Amino acid sequence: AFTIAVPATADTAAEVTIGYLVADPDKVRKFVCVEVSDIPDVAIADPDMMVSMPAGLTAATGMDALTHAIEGYTAKGAWELSDMFHLKAIELISKNLRHSVKEAKAGKPDSGREGMALGQYIAGMGFSNVGLGIDHAMAHTLSTRYDTPHGVACAMLLLIAMEFNKPVAAKRLADVAVAMGVDTEGMDTESAADAAIEAVR
Protein backbone atom coordinates (compact mmCIF):
# COMPACT_ATOMS: atom_id res chain seq x y z
CA ALA A 1 0.00 0.00 0.00
CA PHE A 2 1.12 3.55 -0.72
CA THR A 3 2.03 5.26 2.54
CA ILE A 4 2.61 8.88 3.52
CA ALA A 5 4.30 9.57 6.88
CA VAL A 6 3.89 12.91 8.66
CA PRO A 7 5.65 13.10 12.05
CA ALA A 8 4.06 15.02 14.91
CA THR A 9 7.29 15.34 16.93
CA ALA A 10 10.82 16.42 16.01
CA ASP A 11 12.93 13.53 17.22
CA THR A 12 12.94 9.99 15.89
CA ALA A 13 12.97 10.63 12.14
CA ALA A 14 10.94 7.41 11.92
CA GLU A 15 9.58 8.67 8.63
CA VAL A 16 12.98 8.20 6.95
CA THR A 17 14.59 5.33 8.87
CA ILE A 18 14.41 1.56 8.56
CA GLY A 19 14.41 0.84 12.28
CA TYR A 20 11.88 0.90 15.06
CA LEU A 21 11.74 -0.24 18.67
CA VAL A 22 9.49 -2.70 20.44
CA ALA A 23 9.44 -2.49 24.24
CA ASP A 24 9.01 -5.67 26.27
CA PRO A 25 8.19 -4.62 29.85
CA ASP A 26 8.34 -8.23 31.07
CA LYS A 27 11.95 -8.60 29.92
CA VAL A 28 12.66 -4.95 30.75
CA ARG A 29 14.25 -4.24 27.40
CA LYS A 30 13.68 -2.76 23.99
CA PHE A 31 14.27 -4.65 20.80
CA VAL A 32 15.58 -2.85 17.74
CA CYS A 33 13.79 -4.05 14.62
CA VAL A 34 14.92 -3.28 11.08
CA GLU A 35 12.66 -3.55 8.07
CA VAL A 36 13.30 -1.74 4.79
CA SER A 37 9.65 -2.00 3.77
CA ASP A 38 8.73 0.23 6.74
CA ILE A 39 10.06 3.28 4.91
CA PRO A 40 7.04 5.16 3.54
CA ASP A 41 6.63 6.17 -0.07
CA VAL A 42 6.43 9.84 0.92
CA ALA A 43 7.66 11.58 4.08
CA ILE A 44 6.52 15.10 4.93
CA ALA A 45 8.23 16.88 7.83
CA ASP A 46 5.67 19.63 8.36
CA PRO A 47 6.59 21.93 11.27
CA ASP A 48 2.93 22.96 11.62
CA MET A 49 2.19 19.42 12.81
CA MET A 50 4.59 19.98 15.73
CA VAL A 51 3.35 23.29 17.13
CA SER A 52 1.05 21.68 19.69
CA MET A 53 3.93 19.96 21.51
CA PRO A 54 4.28 21.23 25.10
CA ALA A 55 7.64 22.54 26.28
CA GLY A 56 8.69 19.33 28.06
CA LEU A 57 8.00 17.19 25.01
CA THR A 58 9.71 19.74 22.77
CA ALA A 59 12.84 19.58 24.96
CA ALA A 60 12.87 15.78 25.25
CA THR A 61 12.29 15.08 21.57
CA GLY A 62 14.77 17.77 20.57
CA MET A 63 17.47 16.21 22.73
CA ASP A 64 16.76 12.84 21.14
CA ALA A 65 17.30 14.43 17.72
CA LEU A 66 20.51 16.13 18.87
CA THR A 67 21.73 12.82 20.30
CA HIS A 68 21.02 11.12 16.97
CA ALA A 69 23.12 13.73 15.18
CA ILE A 70 26.05 13.71 17.62
CA GLU A 71 26.13 9.92 17.97
CA GLY A 72 25.83 9.48 14.22
CA TYR A 73 28.71 11.88 13.62
CA THR A 74 30.95 10.11 16.14
CA ALA A 75 29.90 6.58 15.06
CA LYS A 76 32.58 4.19 13.82
CA GLY A 77 30.83 3.87 10.47
CA ALA A 78 30.61 7.62 9.84
CA TRP A 79 31.68 8.76 6.37
CA GLU A 80 31.51 11.87 4.18
CA LEU A 81 27.81 11.73 3.28
CA SER A 82 26.61 10.93 6.79
CA ASP A 83 28.95 13.64 8.12
CA MET A 84 27.19 16.28 6.01
CA PHE A 85 23.79 15.22 7.33
CA HIS A 86 24.90 15.08 10.95
CA LEU A 87 26.81 18.36 11.07
CA LYS A 88 23.93 20.24 9.45
CA ALA A 89 21.48 18.57 11.84
CA ILE A 90 23.61 19.59 14.84
CA GLU A 91 23.71 23.16 13.55
CA LEU A 92 19.95 23.35 12.97
CA ILE A 93 18.96 21.74 16.26
CA SER A 94 21.45 23.83 18.25
CA LYS A 95 20.11 27.03 16.70
CA ASN A 96 16.45 26.18 17.23
CA LEU A 97 15.89 23.88 20.22
CA ARG A 98 16.16 26.39 23.07
CA HIS A 99 14.02 28.88 21.14
CA SER A 100 11.39 26.20 20.45
CA VAL A 101 11.20 25.25 24.14
CA LYS A 102 10.95 28.90 25.18
CA GLU A 103 8.17 29.57 22.67
CA ALA A 104 6.31 26.41 23.73
CA LYS A 105 6.45 27.55 27.37
CA ALA A 106 5.01 30.92 26.36
CA GLY A 107 2.33 29.30 24.19
CA LYS A 108 3.52 31.30 21.17
CA PRO A 109 3.78 30.28 17.52
CA ASP A 110 7.26 28.93 17.05
CA SER A 111 9.56 30.04 14.27
CA GLY A 112 12.13 27.44 15.36
CA ARG A 113 9.97 24.42 14.52
CA GLU A 114 11.01 24.43 10.87
CA GLY A 115 14.67 24.08 11.82
CA MET A 116 13.82 21.34 14.29
CA ALA A 117 11.72 19.46 11.72
CA LEU A 118 14.53 19.58 9.16
CA GLY A 119 17.26 18.88 11.71
CA GLN A 120 15.66 15.70 13.04
CA TYR A 121 14.84 14.59 9.48
CA ILE A 122 18.38 14.83 8.16
CA ALA A 123 19.83 13.39 11.39
CA GLY A 124 17.67 10.34 10.69
CA MET A 125 18.96 10.12 7.14
CA GLY A 126 22.47 10.10 8.55
CA PHE A 127 22.20 7.70 11.47
CA SER A 128 20.11 5.19 9.55
CA ASN A 129 23.23 4.65 7.42
CA VAL A 130 25.87 4.51 10.18
CA GLY A 131 24.13 3.55 13.42
CA LEU A 132 24.21 5.15 16.84
CA GLY A 133 26.27 4.57 19.97
CA ILE A 134 26.51 3.97 23.68
CA ASP A 135 24.04 6.71 24.60
CA HIS A 136 21.17 4.99 22.82
CA ALA A 137 22.29 1.56 24.01
CA MET A 138 22.02 2.75 27.61
CA ALA A 139 18.95 4.93 27.05
CA HIS A 140 16.90 1.99 25.78
CA THR A 141 17.50 0.12 29.03
CA LEU A 142 17.05 3.18 31.24
CA SER A 143 13.78 4.18 29.61
CA THR A 144 12.39 0.64 29.79
CA ARG A 145 13.45 -0.12 33.37
CA TYR A 146 12.38 3.22 34.85
CA ASP A 147 9.63 4.22 32.42
CA THR A 148 11.64 7.30 31.46
CA PRO A 149 10.72 9.07 28.21
CA HIS A 150 13.26 8.10 25.56
CA GLY A 151 14.38 11.66 24.81
CA VAL A 152 14.88 12.38 28.52
CA ALA A 153 16.98 9.23 28.88
CA CYS A 154 19.10 10.25 25.88
CA ALA A 155 19.57 13.75 27.30
CA MET A 156 20.58 12.40 30.72
CA LEU A 157 23.26 10.19 29.17
CA LEU A 158 24.59 12.36 26.34
CA LEU A 159 27.31 14.13 28.35
CA ILE A 160 28.47 10.82 29.81
CA ALA A 161 28.62 9.27 26.34
CA MET A 162 30.54 12.23 24.92
CA GLU A 163 33.07 12.08 27.78
CA PHE A 164 33.41 8.31 27.31
CA ASN A 165 34.02 8.71 23.56
CA LYS A 166 36.36 11.70 23.84
CA PRO A 167 39.64 9.71 23.93
CA VAL A 168 38.88 8.24 20.49
CA ALA A 169 36.62 10.95 19.06
CA ALA A 170 38.12 14.27 20.19
CA LYS A 171 38.52 15.60 16.64
CA ARG A 172 34.92 14.77 15.81
CA LEU A 173 33.68 16.31 19.05
CA ALA A 174 35.67 19.43 18.17
CA ASP A 175 33.71 19.53 14.90
CA VAL A 176 30.50 19.19 16.93
CA ALA A 177 31.50 22.29 18.90
CA VAL A 178 31.88 24.29 15.68
CA ALA A 179 28.54 23.01 14.38
CA MET A 180 26.94 24.14 17.64
CA GLY A 181 28.27 27.65 17.08
CA VAL A 182 31.18 27.57 19.52
CA ASP A 183 34.17 29.75 18.59
CA THR A 184 37.03 27.25 18.78
CA GLU A 185 39.70 29.49 17.27
CA GLY A 186 42.89 29.15 19.29
CA MET A 187 41.73 25.95 21.01
CA ASP A 188 43.53 22.66 20.68
CA THR A 189 41.50 19.59 19.73
CA GLU A 190 40.91 18.40 23.28
CA SER A 191 39.79 21.85 24.45
CA ALA A 192 37.41 22.12 21.51
CA ALA A 193 36.01 18.67 22.34
CA ASP A 194 35.47 19.84 25.91
CA ALA A 195 33.73 22.93 24.53
CA ALA A 196 31.28 20.67 22.66
CA ILE A 197 30.46 18.88 25.91
CA GLU A 198 29.94 22.21 27.66
CA ALA A 199 27.74 23.45 24.81
CA VAL A 200 25.50 20.41 25.25
CA ARG A 201 25.43 20.92 29.03
Where are these regions (language model features)?
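Proline/glycine-rich low-complexity loops and linkers
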Residues: A1-G19
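Acidic, glycine-rich active-site loops and adjacent beta-strand->loop/helix elements
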Residues: A8-T12, M49, L159-M162
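Glycine-rich phosphate/pyrophosphate-binding beta-alpha loops
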Residues: D11, Y121-C154
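Carboxylate- and glycine-rich phosphate/diphosphate-binding segment that chelates Mg2+/Mn2+
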Residues: V16-V130
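Short beta-alpha connecting loops at secondary-structure transitions
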Residues: V51, H140-T141, E185
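Amphipathic alpha-helical interaction segments
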Residues: M84-K88, L92, G115-L118, A137-H140, ...
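Gly/Pro-rich interdomain helix-loop hinge
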Residues: R145-R201
